[in-house]
Amino acid sequence: MANESKCPFHQTAGGGTSNRDWWPDQLNLKILHQHSRKSDPMDPDFDYAKAFKSLDFQALKKDLTALMTDSQDWWPADFGHYGPLFIRMAWHSAGTYRIGDGRGGAGSGQQRFAPLNSWPDNVSLDKARRLLWPIKQKYGNKISWADLIVLTGNVALESMGFKTFGFSGGRADVWEPDEDVYWGSEKVWLGGDTRYGKAEAPGKGDLVAEPAKRPQEQGRNLAGERNLENPLAAVQMGLIYVNPEGPEGNPDPVASGKDIRDTFGRMAMNDEETVALIAGGHAFGKTHGAGPADNVGAEPEAAGLEQQGFGWHNTFGTGKGGDTITSGLEVTWTSTPTKWSNEYLNNLFNFEWELTKSPAGAHQWRPKDGKGANTVPDAHDTTKRHAPSMLTSDLALRFDPIYEPIARRFKDNPDQLADAFARAWYKLIHRDMGPLARYLGPEMPNEELLWQDPLPKAGPQPSEADIAAHKAKVLASGLSVAELVSTAWASASTFRGSDKRGGANGARLRLAPQKDWAANQGLDKVLAALEKIRDEGGNKISLADLIVLAGSAAVEKAAKDAGHAISVPFHPGRVDASQAQTDVESFAVLEPLADGFRNFSKARYSVKAEKLLLDKAQLLTLTAPELTVLVGGLRVLGANHGGSKEGVFTDKPGVLTNDFFRNLLDMGVEWKPTSADNEHFEGRDRKTGAVKWTGSRVDLVFGSHAQLRALSEVYGSGDAAAKFVKDFVAAWVKVMELDRFDLK
């Protein structure tokens, strides 16, 4: 407009070309500083677990049950029941979990934020969450969005006649999107070429939270199969699992079965659990594809302000009810879509199926010869009836040679399906919650499940005198500081803040598979010596506690030898798990394929070593200063894997000095690569040319990266020796106690 006032600002804060635009390969330390107090509106002393315990749980469930059939004009319930919609909401919240790095899942309510709130697979879930707002508003901070989303799915099942296995609360909300999760590199929704084109052949390794850069490959492994990039667990950008029309839209049930096995396996489900989840979930509700997709508007993150967080505005007909467009598929599986039954499997096997298309043009299946006509109700018009229909991914349960006998057994034994679905659903919605110590609420099952990494109950705790005696024996055992520190680190650093698995509690370092991991070679000698000390001391302390105590005693000694008298805090209470309590296959995903804190890498990866270090630090919930001080301290303590001298920038190994930083920042040293791949370096005296040090990428990044160098300068300063020791001890104790939820 001619009379429009000109804004004095062309851009506002945060706009313009960013550092990431200029240097896209730059190490992104921001992932270490997510979810801070600055983004959290709750009071500093707010305790969600305490608030949840004050919740009138049964009253909440009663309100949720009433909501199921309280259809709203602005978003009418299919078949008069919101249950199927809420099941999908809970499933899609939990279903983002993947075992590769433990990220994703329902644990913090991320479905409220980008990108998940705008994924194509989550169309209409904006409506589901908005239907819940009056209930969330009523109960306030006593129930988090994360818990409410999952609980609502459970109540939905119960309201339709299904007996669930239980529910546990304890998922605290966060207030901003996760920035550490790698969802893929595709730039368009539903793209899948990059995640298959980038996948490595077996035995190589493409992992962690940031994409690798390399030429496009064919997306097929050596056996000719689709090979999905790790750690991803979905076949296309913006999907939870598989394309329901079949791989890349190809309606091939057998090929779909292979995709299903891969994706569900990557979220910790075996074949029986997978069949149970699909057959159980598709006992309810329908999909939505009333018209062409070009009737659907922008997703929530791209929609106008007037939409108030809603997205996908639909201009087809009324845009709701019978005119809803979600996936583009128009499928109703059974004649009782709001009642638990075994009809899904009966229909799957009793009809022969032919390919057809939805009103939106998507591939789906109908019974041949017009069978099943008029057996299925319409979701909104009582005068209409339909035949049952299926997705390509449904037919995979019948035509995949592994799924078929499982599905047929469930068809013939409905009680087995009910039990398997109840257990698999419970696993789905709790998989990222960690140990039972985090579970809350009156509906927690009594049965302990192997996938929960069970631990025995703690017995009597060692006294202060017992602790002192064991520390003295450890230090007199002949074990070196490096051996004790590296063993404690190996035990504790398996923890993942993503799914709260791993850690020192349980002493699983001595059990399969951890005892056989490449990263843990040489630790058997230390473990044997510690077990002997424990036994000779009358078993007054668990091995799990003793491993940590021994490492902490070594840190105290190393600090004392550097002239700093400091006590490393130690809290007993850890227990020793048995091999029977340890699922070898489940724990295998915790193996450190690379651990920059120990200068260890099992193989060469397409991801740079410093990015693997950053990924590890984020999983350990470390800040950038904690990352920095730990690497510097572990190097001078000699904790490198296999006794490697790379990064040990000190002539006093085993003494807790700030020498790593002082020598890395020494301008008298010139660094040059010694390998063609720039993985290894040597530092030479600028005057004499003599080699003084050798280092890895992980070591040199602390002098190269501007932020890490700034932190290194703090710890390398002349007056920083005491601060370095203090900060190292604090970060050390943090890692040692990451899995001590009993202390929090």
Curated annotation (Swiss-Prot):
Stated EC number for the protein is 1.11.1.21
The Gene Ontology biological process terms listed for this entry are:
cellular response to hydrogen peroxide; hydrogen peroxide catabolic process
The record's keywords, sorted A to Z, are: Heme, Hydrogen peroxide, Iron, Metal-binding, Oxidoreductase, Peroxidase
**Pfam families in UniProt:** peroxidase
Q: Name the active site residues.
A: 92 (proton acceptor)
The record's catalysed reaction(s) read: H2O2 + AH2 = A + 2 H2O; 2 H2O2 = O2 + 2 H2O
Any GO MF annotation of the entry = catalase activity
Q: What does this protein do?
A: Bifunctional enzyme with both catalase and broad-spectrum peroxidase activity.
This protein is called Catalase-peroxidase
**What gene name does this entry carry?**
katG
